[in-house]
UniProtKB/Swiss-Prot annotation:
Subunit details: Monomer.
Protein localization: Cytoplasm
Tree of life domain: Bacteria
Similarity section: Belongs to the class-I aminoacyl-tRNA synthetase family. ValS type 2 subfamily.
Gene responsible for this protein: valS
Protein name per its UniProtKB record: Valine--tRNA ligase
Domain commentary: ValRS has two distinct active sites: one for aminoacylation and one for editing. The misactivated threonine is translocated from the active site to the editing site.
Enzyme Commission no: 6.1.1.9
Amino acid composition bias (Polar residues), ranges on this chain: 1-13
Sorted UniProt keywords: Aminoacyl-tRNA synthetase, ATP-binding, Cytoplasm, Ligase, Nucleotide-binding, Protein biosynthesis
KW Flavoprotein (keyword) present: no
Annotated GO CC locations: cytosol
Protein role: Catalyzes the attachment of valine to tRNA(Val). As ValRS can inadvertently accommodate and process structurally similar amino acids such as threonine, to avoid such errors, it has a 'posttransfer' editing activity that hydrolyzes mischarged Thr-tRNA(Val) in a tRNA-dependent manner.
Short sequence motif 'KMSKS' region: positions: 595-599
Length: 870
């Protein structure tokens, strides 16, 4: 773990016990961020922990630092921080690390575009290499793998600082001493160690099999990284030839794969084709004999009802190939082009010539050429029929995936093992989901898995597989007997280190070795974040006090990736869940509820909105986004949060301006006791909501109470609170004591949401930090008041103010006489605070009448006061 210190030259130590003349929100983030860092306010000290129950451990998602910052980052990470701050105030030792997911394909792509380079592993290392002064992403300079990795490390360091500056500005209470990266030596050690353990138990294996392949990035892709997108295509009706001269017509959107056809498949119950099962036909253009077979996955109502099986056009082809034990006929290479060498199953010269016409071409060009040849040969019936088909894409790619036979590493995840699948489904039921319905997304994903987890990538900046392969006397690698390092040697890099018992000079020669050339998918490392941060196989004491963790926040789009992969790894390695609960955030959309994207021009830069409105305003808006629900972004809403933060400053200054209060026993006035009774209920409601991880509900009740407190209670009692030398000394003391008690409690209730403004006000009159103070409990507040009293007073104030608003006169306008009629219980409450009520409403004569089922006011207004000079 590395420690990074936040420094600033503009922060000044706070002057405690002094209320500023003009409170302001500006500068609070820098001021308090510096102080919190200097005081190590949020640092976790395992030596102070006696038992696991004392700790609240958070598995924070390590953001992909090569990505673009957007409001969704701020919202979801703020949600986590409100929970962390609440748990800290409840007395928990909060273990709240932060990490950066800095390896993998997104980082490589950013480095390529930023520096105008590409990795060519065949090139030697150049210690004096300098990136182009004017990078051109379209003319990338080839560099060695080592040079490329160095640039990845260099750029991620810059990106990581940008993220860290944002998180500090937002006020995340993470422990920056626990900072980690997914490419650090320690993370590599953990990833390689877990892999070796998986391999030893038979949970990780190497297989040469059909693989989803992205031709742009030249790498394998896992099922969890797929996106099904609409893709324009056309159905082509092709005739396959029977020995008797009849044709069997199929319809396909991929005629370029005709040379890879190994069978025709129809449903066993389809009467149209039952007489063909067990016979053979020959393919158009290439004259290759293929069988006609039955399989229940064939769709009778799709196209002609009979389909050609090619290796491989889609995942259905893979299933048919595997279950019907069909031959492999590969014609597409890793670059997405038709293989140059004519396949051995294409025999006659004319067919070979037709294949040579498409050899080396992209699939798009090959499709066009094949269709032209089919038209010329008369083997295509009619014109192509345009259609929109669903195609699998890599989530970060822009071309449909191909399926190519390659050798890859896998980890078992239940995709082909019902017992393991059921065990992982049961883990999902053990897990507490916030909100609960998100569990169904997990279950749907696990139930829909069709293969094991492919974890190898044909890329460069990632965690290497700790594997070498011995070379036989013929120079061929023995993949069945890999060479593995001792755990104590980890981390290792097989590309630059020889295995034990070999010399570097034996690399790549007969009788020597080769290193596994691939790296682990970034999810294979980030799936181990619970183990990385808790000290698994590094710090037994820390691990015992923090694992399994308590809380795993994430967005709903990564349930299939990050949630599931961590459950898999912890189940296999630790025999348990990695954490007790998962909290799912929604997306932040634009005001039209469309997903924000750079290409649409509807993104917002988080630092700009923080600079404009302040961090507390942004945090308020974030907390108003309910768990699991998408939330539209609107800058106008930030103004509401800023207004709340500013009101806390000004109302606090106002309250503290009344002077010192007394003891709780000095609170005797019915209005004061009623307000505190409401506060007591608020504490219970906010606590219950937070205990259910419903931060939005907690904020809503706090804010509702606060505005009523300011608009009604403060206005009602301010004359009495000022009157410390008058006849009602006890009433003034009661008001001032109630005010300070309420302010104390409300600051603590708001602290998880608005950490900067609450800390600022706390420093005016309290020692220490509001964030290390205790969460309020109902026992702190008197329970003798009637909570309905202030509700009735608020209703009366609405009427008294309303009569002035109706007549469009200032609120300072006196009411000569007023009569309030209401039910007896309401009248009794109003009489109890008659003195405060007449003062605040400037009513000279107030009478009450019992009757009716609602409050009714009759009033006579006096002359409006003269306008005050500005």
């Amino acid at each position: 773990m590395t420690s990074q210190t936040f420094t600033t030259s503009s922060a000044t130590p706070p002057t405690r016990g002094v209320v500023p003349d003009k409170p302001a929100l500006e500068g609070l983030e820098v001021k308090w961020g510096k102080i919190w860092e200097d005081e190590q306010l949020y640092a976790f000290d395992a030596t102070t922990v006696d038992s696991r129950e004392q700790v609240f451990a958070i598995d924070t998602p390590p953001p992909t630092v090569s990505g673009h910052l957007h409001p969704g980052h701020v919202f979801s990470y703020t949600h986590t921080d409100t929970v962390a701050r609440y748990q800290r105030m409840r007395g928990k030792k909060v273990f709240y690390p932060m990490g950066w997911d800095d390896n993998g394909l997104p980082t490589e792509r950013r480095v390529q575009n930023y520096y105008g380079v590409r990795c060519d592993p065949s090139l030697p290392y150049d210690p004096d290499f300098t990136p182009p002064s004017k990078p051109n992403p379209k003319r990338q300079v080839p560099i060695s793998r080592r040079n490329f990795v160095e640039l990845c490390v260099e750029l991620t360091a810059v990106d990581e600082k940008t993220f860290q500056d944002l998180w500090r500005a937002v006020g995340l209470s993470v422990d920056w001493n626990q900072l980690y990266t997914t490419i650090s030596p320690e993370s590599q050690r953990i990833a390689q160690l877990a892999f070796l353990r998986n391999y030893a138990r038979g949970e990780a294996y190497l297989s040469d099999a059909p693989t989803l392949w992205d031709v742009t990035f030249s790498t394998a892709v896992a099922q969890a990284e797929l996106e099904a997108r609409d893709y324009p295509g056309a159905y082509h009706r092709l005739g396959f030839h029977r020995p008797n001269g009849e044709d069997v017509f199929i319809e396909t959107t991929r005629p370029e794969l005709l040379a890879a056809c190994c069978a025709l498949i129809a449903h066993p119950d389809d009467e149209r084709y039952q007489h063909l099962f067990g016979t053979t036909v020959t393919t158009p253009l290439y004259g290759v004999e293929v069988p006609v077979l039955a399989h229940s996955a064939a769709e009778m109502d799709k196209g002609a009802g009979i389909a050609m099986c090619c290796t491989f056009g889609d995942l259905t082809d893979v299933a048919w190939w595997r279950e019907l034990q069909l031959p492999t006929r590969t014609i597409i290479g890793r670059d997405g082009r038709i293989l140059s060498e004519t396949p051995q199953w294409i025999i006659d010269a004319g067919s070979a010539e037709r294949y040579e016409a498409i050899a080396g071409k992209t699939t798009f060009t090959a499709r066009k050429l094949v269709v032209e040849a089919l038209v010329e040969s008369g083997e295509m019936d009619g014109e192509p029929k345009p259609t929109q088909r669903k195609a699998n894409f890599y989530e970060k790619g822009d071309k449909p995936l191909e399926i190519i036979g390659t050798r890859q590493w896998y980890i078992r995840n239940g995709g082909r093992d019902d017992d393991l699948r059921n065990a992982l489904l049961e883990r999902g039921r053990e897990l507490e989901w916030v909100p609960e319905h998100m569990r169904h997304r997990y279950e749907n994903w696990v139930e829909g898995l069709n293969g094991d987890w492919l974890i190898s990538r044909q890329r460069f900046f990632g965690v290497p597989f700790p594997v070498w392969y011995p070379l036989g006397t013929d120079g061929e690698p023995d993949y069945d007997h890999p060479l593995l390092p001792d755990e104590s040697a980890l981390p290792v890099d097989p590309a630059s280190q020889p295995p034990s018992g070999y010399q570097e000079s034996q690399r790549g020669v007969a009788g020597g070795f080769i290193g596994d050339p691939d790296v682990m998918d970034t999810w294979a490392t980030s799936s181990l974040t619970p183990q990385i941060v808790t000290g698994w196989e590094r710090d037994a004491d820390l691990f015992a006090k923090t694992f399994p963790m308590d809380f795993a926040p994430e967005a709903h789009d990564i349930i299939r990736t990050w949630v599931f992969s961590r459950v898999v790894r912890a189940h296999l390695e630790n025999g348990m869940l990695p954490w007790k609960r998962a909290a799912i955030s929604g997306f932040v959309t634009d005001p039209d509820r469309k997903k924000m994207s750079k290409s649409k021009g509807n993104t917002v830069v988080p630092t700009e909105i923080i600079d404009q409105f302040g961090a507390d305003a942004v945090r308020w808006r974030a907390a108003m986004a309910r768990p699991g629900m998408d939330s539209p972004f609107d800058k106008a809403q930030m103004k509401v949060g800023r207004r709340l933060a500013m009101k806390i400053l000004n109302a606090s200054k106002f309250v503290l301006g009344f002077g010192e209060g007394g003891q709780v026993c000095d609170i005797t006035n019915p209005a004061d006791l009623s307000m505190l009774a409401g506060l007591r209920e608020l504490i219970a409601e906010a606590t219950e909501a937070f205990d259910k991880f419903n931060y939005t509900a907690a904020l809503e009740v706090c804010e509702q109470f606060f505005w009523t407190f300011c608009d009604d209670y403060l206005e009602l009692i301010k004359e009495r609170a000022y009157d410390s030398e008058g006849a009602d000394n006890a009433g003034a003391l009661s008001a001032r004591t109630a005010l300070r008690l309420a302010l104390d409690v409300m600051l603590r209730l708001f602290a998880p949401f608005l950490p900067f403004v609450t800390e600022e006000v706390w420093s005016w009159w309290k020692d220490g930090s509001v964030h290390t103070s205790s969460w309020p409990t109902a026992d702190e507040v008197p329970a003798t008041g009637d909570v309905d009293l202030m509700s009735d007073v608020s209703a009366a104030l609405v009427e008294l103010r309303g009569v002035k608003s109706t007549h469009k006169v200032p609120m300072r306008t006196p009411i000569l006489s007023a009569r309030i009629s209401a039910p007896a219980s309401v009248i009794a409450n109003l009489k109890a605070v008659e003195s405060d009520l007449t003062k605040v409403s400037k009513t000279e004569s107030l009478t009450f009448l019992t009757g009716g089922d609602k409050l009714v006011l009759e009033a006579e207004l006096g002359e409006p006061p003269a306008k005050r000079k500005k």
